[in-house]
Amino acid sequence: MNSTTMNIPAQAQAKFREGLALHQQGQLAPAQALYEQVLQLIPTHFDALYLSGVLAAESNNPEGALVMFDKAIDSVPTHVNAHIDRGMVLCKLGRHGPALQNFEKALTLAPNNSEAYYGLGSAHMQMEEHETALQYFDRALALAPNYPEAHGDRGAVLQSLGRLDEALQSIERAIALAPTVEVNHYNRGFVLSALGRNDEAMTSYDKAIELKPDYATAYNNRGNLNWTLTRHRAAIEDFDAALSIKPDLPDLFGMRLHMKMAVCDWPALEAQKKLLVEMIDRGERAASPFAAMAALDTLDMQRKCAQIWLKSKRVAGAALGSLRKPPRHKRIRVAYVSSEFRESPAAYNMVGLFENHDRTRFETIAISAGPDNPGEMRSRLKRAFDVFVDAGKKSDIAIAALMREMEIDIAVDSMGPTGDDRTGIFIARGAPIQVNHFGFASGASHFEYIVADPIAIPPDHRAYYLEKMASLPHTLFATDRERRIAERTPTRAEAGLPEDGFVFCSFNNSYKITPEVFDVWMRLLNKVPGSVLWLRGTNSLMPGNLREEAHKRGIDPARLVFAPIAPKMEDHLARLRLADLFVDCFAFNAQTTASDALWAGVPVLTCLGPTMVSRVAGGLLNAIDMPELITRTHDQYEALAFSLATEPRRLAQIRAKLAENRLCKPLFDTPLFTRHLENAYTQMYERYQADLPIEDIQVRA
């Protein structure tokens, strides 16, 4: 044997020590080069194999890491950390089954290894098996009480389970042990925001971004929080930052576009909408279905967006197992699921429905999936139901499991994929019959039925919906005929309106206002001397942007009047009487605000569009027998608005008819609407109990 051969082990060990020192200093590339030299000398050198795997994992090369960990395990099959690290890499790749096998093998080699238990918890957390994950994190912490990663991920799991106070304790323990780990500050911000402790949440997001300046999800969540806190400019800046860092962050592009629409920032609007369509056509999750409803003007694109969004939502509904058929109940158990069971537009519309249910035939349950905001409306809602479940802090899976325990027959989604999305409850199958009462093209197989009406969802739109139709004869939206209007109507001067000029009104949410409808409104102001446009000031940036747009169109910005939020709903309804004509938006109609105007006696002018949300107001007008206010083209809309603004007698006739129809036509006949909906529920239930296939349901007038 020559001297060179005799020195190979010593050469290899020297190079390994040099590589290890560089690795520990964070110099990954030169360290890797030295590990490779070691392996050229001794291909089975375990430490070089193992640390090459660690280095590859640190370099975001998981496939390369797997190759090296496999070689390391072949060299030393009993090395515990090699099995654990291989399992963590497999978790990163989403290969959870093999990862679990590695962690379990590690535990057979070292039964009290806290890192192996942590790995099992991580895998089950990623599989959204949160209860199982929690058990493993607890085992890890029983063995290693000062394990910061286990505390942090335990907090994340508790957050997913809706156990927010416990989650906060775990996350804060993790921060105390490892104060520079950015994800724990991010998770702390998320939990604090959910608890309504917004200022503290903001501090946590700030810290997360300070520790990781390219933390896109932290910018995204801080943007949402800034919007909630009415810091609108800061919110958009945060969304811009998130988009520049991670353009493919799920839903981010659509949310930023939605915010731009909300502040009426239009210079790049059409280009952004076109880009959104291209992203959805490529199958990218670029927007939530709610954001898409305002930005996309075809049912086909709205459905595509919804299907992509649902496909990527990883809710472990299978964890609950198959749904057992509940026994026939004396009263049909109907659960309404919403995060809006508080002072909210949805609650003002729907509370009358809940109060009018036939309690001899239906047992009504409220699943309140949002915050508990005490107030007059919350109290009224609690009285309206047989059972009121405050589930705001529960996870989607926990709520679905609870609904199964309660043997709910029919679960009604009364909110859809809004900001407080709880779609997971329905994906996890809380009831055997699930009903979409939000009206959007969900693309979802977890709803059996969608509530429809002849205008909002006409027969030729049927192909865009997977659900069977439960068609009501007049309107699919509930109203409350008991809504009080304050006796005193404020003066026009008090509302900032001219005493004599014609008042066009549109209290729509600002994201519904588009350049197309604004062009029409400005032409109307130009053609009707002394007229004004009365809008709702929904955020701090919208008035300035719209005034600038008016100026561009040659209209004095002072002719745009922005109403503040009224202290009480009854005061808002009273001030609506000051308007002469409510002019609707095109792509996304007024719903609650149109109902408000009609209840206050103000005519609503609308134009039917190609999507459900662009036909809603038409459905309301049809139900109050005012078809003469439904137009089919933008030109017709503009011509009729001008006619009503310049022909006082014609407008007076319209207002007189509205006053007469208000209490004698179906729109505000809450008991009648309730009977029709109950008819639909009964047909759904009887078909299910008889094991008949799901079919369209037509409720007759």
Task: Label every model-predicted segment.
Residues 607-608, 612-616:
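Glycine-rich phosphate-binding loop and adjacent beta-alpha segment
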Residues 117, 361-363, 522-552:
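A conserved nucleotide-sugar
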Residues 415, 584-590, 608:
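Short Ser/Thr-rich beta->loop micro-motif in glycosyltransferases that lines
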Residues 1-497, 509, 519, 548-555, ...:
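Alpha-helical solenoid repeat scaffolds of the TPR/TPR-like class and their adjacent stem/linker regions
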